[in-house]
Amino acid sequence: MFLLTPVLVAVVCILVVWVFKNADRNLEKKKEEAQVQPWVDEDLKDSTEDLQVEEDAEEWQEAEESVEHIPFSHTRYPEQEMRMRSQEFYELLNKRRSVRFISSEHVPMEVIENVIKAAGTAPSGAHTEPWTFVVVKDPDMKHKIREIIEEEEEINYMKRMGKRWVTDLKKLRTNWIKEYLDTAPVLILIFKQVHGFAANGKKKVHYYNEISVSIACGLLLAALQNAGLVTVTTTPLNCGPRLRVLLGRPSHEKLLVLLPVGYPSRDATVPDLKRKALDQIMVTV
């Protein structure tokens, strides 16, 4: 019969204590990570969309149509002009700042249409163009959007974002109050289309939809700067599903970015931030 000696009992006790201590450490580590990285993809939170079940292959349309290829038209500049144009474009974009104080002054709709057309020239996976730009000008609708965002943002700051994230934002003097959502003459909400639809009603795959739409957002920011307008890039955490329903967008569209657009108010201020030097962002091999 096997007998437990005092030494063996002691060893077993030590092992049990060690296991429980490590379990506690892992639990605490997971809690800390959750506080540091509180982001949850809104796609996982939108209860209004269809359940994610395996779908019949017949519901999807394969792209089989042929596309004619045509000669490429290109303008090549002399090297000196290339240097000048690239420098001027850099200097223009280097003046771009995130502006939270936006005037209510009217912005011509033609300008908004042009900057969105510019954004729509972005490349996309298999040329699916998986973006929808929703332009909001109606004051009542803007205020409803503000109410939803501020309600969720207050919870974000108080509970979801975690101490480190909130601390990192203090230097920007930002909080859950978003007055610019009322004052800006135009709000542009950019939705990614998770999939599209063919003419026969079947679903079309939208490859790399989030990357494609993100590139379009970058072009939109550059176009706004070129037009002399300002904005602040807003990613409404946990607001996407409610805003999508408010704006009557279908369930296969997910809100990616919201941009309040207009002229800066006369008393607008921005943080005196410095951008990284070239040698900190570029590596030549």
UniProtKB/Swiss-Prot annotation:
Q: Where the protein is mainly located, per its record?
A: membrane
- Recorded catalytic activity of this chain's protein: 2 iodide + L-tyrosine + 2 NADP(+) = 3,5-diiodo-L-tyrosine + 2 NADPH + H(+); iodide + L-tyrosine + NADP(+) = 3-iodo-L-tyrosine + NADPH; 3-iodo-L-tyrosine + iodide + NADP(+) = 3,5-diiodo-L-tyrosine + NADPH + H(+); L-tyrosine + chloride + NADP(+) = 3-chloro-L-tyrosine + NADPH
**One GO location term (cellular component):** plasma membrane
Give the record's keywords alphabetically. Answer: Cell membrane, Cytoplasmic vesicle, Flavoprotein, FMN, Membrane, NADP, Oxidoreductase, Transmembrane, Transmembrane helix
The transmembrane residues are 1-21
Which Pfam families does the UniProt entry name for this protein?
A: Nitroreductase
Under the heading SUPFAM superfamilies, the entry gives: FMN-dependent nitroreductase-like
Give the source's domain of life in one word: Eukaryota
Q: What is its EC number?
A: 1.21.1.1
Q: Give the recorded effect for residue 153 to Q.
A: Loss of enzyme activity
Under the heading PANTHER family, the entry gives:
IODOTYROSINE DEIODINASE 1, NADPH NITROREDUCTASE
Entry protein name:
Iodotyrosine deiodinase 1
Q: Which organism is it from?
A: Mus musculus
This protein's gene is called Iyd
